[in-house]
Every structure is written in structure tokens, then in C-alpha cells.
Curated annotation (Swiss-Prot):
One of its GO terms (cellular component) is membrane. GO terms for molecular function: N-acyltransferase activity. This is UDP-3-O-acylglucosamine N-acyltransferase. Its EC number is 2.3.1.191.
Amino acid sequence: MPQELVYTLQQLADLLKVEVQGNTETPISGVEEISAAKAHHVTFLDNEKYARFIKITEAGAIILSKAQAQKYGHLNKNFLIVSEFPSIAFQKCIELFISPVDSGFPGIHPTAVIHPTASIGKDVCIEPYAVICQHACIGDSTYIGTGSVIGAYSTLGEHCLVHPKVVVRERVEIGKRVIIQPGAVIGSCGFGYITNAFGRHKHLKHLGKVIIEDDVEIGANTTIDRGRFKNSVIREGTKIDNQVQIAHHVEVGKHSMIVAQAGIAGSTKIGNHVIIGGQTGITGHISITDHVIMMAQTGVTKSISSPGIYGGAPARPYQEIHRQVAKIRSLPKLEERLGMLEEKVKGLSAQSTELQITP
């Protein structure tokens, strides 16, 4: 185990390039969430829902934004104050105190199978039983995990991290600093079939590629299919969660986020800075503009041309959903009022009948 690191609060502030308030000699040797932090931990407040813990936490220091420091700075606590985004400073603390766990298999393991035509860069790690097929190209300082397969003519850029049991099929192009979690399959054939006169389904050849640009992250057991003729493309900086299905010839823009179990059907184009909530389904052959947020379990059946928050099935603006939900919640009271009106109408009807038969 690595030796425990200890910083004074002032040393930590200097490393993070932030302001410090409180006892600058407080020793800090670890990180923890605000509700469980002890005296040797640094923690942070990112969500105001957890502000109640500021008074009771035992943390040696709390990372706050300047706005938060104005609200809570009067408390007798040690604070590290950043301009904004405490979670970013906290992530830097995590990197300081917690080193990644090494697999223990440096270099190229003797059980790895590497085709003689493959090109392997400098300082590459290829773990046991990984397979690198013909004419594949692995960039410098890239890591290929145990049992992973890199297909023929596929390329990976520098500083990529391919975890165990990943399959990268043939002719896939992957940029720099891409992270692929275990079980992901990149470049499988799309779900394209033609049905003949006898009702039998015949699979169509898919000749396109999958192109993954720089700084993309792909979650565990996520699948990205190649296009039939054109390429499936994941643009720079996009983050994809676990168990996401991206069909043939889909294009996802820059710096978007796709949450677990979402599915995007073929030939759909997703814009930049789009957030797709968990279990969202998006039909094929449509486009989603930039800066759209889709809530969990949204069903998107038509193109979205205006930025904003959408939800429901079929997808519609959040404000519209909010109004509809409010009306639904009022239905029991409306039903009660309707029942009372019906009773009054019955009473009035009975009185009218009595008046009609009175001589």
C-alpha cells in the first residue's frame, strides 16, 4: 500500500490555488463526503440540499464556492474557498490523495496475442489474453485490459484506457484519452434487415465505421453500432453511461451526456451539449438540436428544434408536462365537486317534477 499523504490546510490550498479560511495548520490526509467526513478529511458542498451538514460535519476542511462562503463563512469551520464549482476542486483533492490501483501487469503480457502487422506505440500496456488483430494501431501510453479485443485496421490514439473484456470491432477509429469501461462493444453491425416475399429476414451488410473522437467516455456494457454505409460518430468530450444502445449511423455531438439504458435508433443526429436522461428512447431518422435536456424515460418520436427541457412520451416541453400534472392532481377534487353538482341537479329536478304535478 502507498504511504499516506498528509498536507496542512495551507499546503492543500496552495496546491489547489484557492483561498483558505481557518486554521492553516490543520492536517488533511484524505477525502470524504460531507455527511461522513472526519477530522482528517477534506470535503465539499456542491448541492444545497446537504447544507445542513456544514454545522455538524467533523471534516477538517470544507470546500465552498465564494457565494457559499458568504452564507456559511461565519461558522467556526475551516474552509477552502473557490470561485465556483467546489466539486472540481474536490476532484483534484481525490487525485492528490487516492492513486489508481495498478493491475500489476506492466508492459505487454506474454499471453497477449498481437498480430505481427499491428502497430504498438511507446509505453503501451497490454494485459493477459488481450487480442490485437492485423493492422490495428495502438497509440502511445494506451492501456488494453485483460481479454479485450482490438479488431483489424482499428486505431486507438494516445493515453486511451480500454478496460477488460471490451470488444472494438474492425475499422473503428478512436481518438485520444478515450475511456471504455468493461463489456462495451464498439463497431458491431447495426440492426438492419430486409424481409423477403416469404416473410424471412435477411441481415444487411454494414460497411460504415464507428468514429470516437477525443476525450469520450463509454460506460460498461454499452454498444455502439457501425453505420450501413455512413459512419456512426461520437463527437469530442461526450460521456456515455452504462448499458446505452447507439444504433447504426447515429451522430452524437460534442460534450453531450447519455445516461444509463437510453437507446438511440438509427440515423438520428444529436446536437452538442445535449443531456439524455436514463431509459430515454429516441426514434430513428430525426434530429435533436443543441442544448436540449431530456428527462428520464422520455419518448422522443419527432425532431426537437428548440433548446430546453423535455419529458414524457411523446416528448413535450417540461412546462407543458408540469401544467398537465397539476391538472391531473386536481381531478379528485373536480370529481368531488361534480358529484355534489349532480346531487344538486337531482334535487332541482325532483322539485321541478313536484311543481309540475301539483294542481
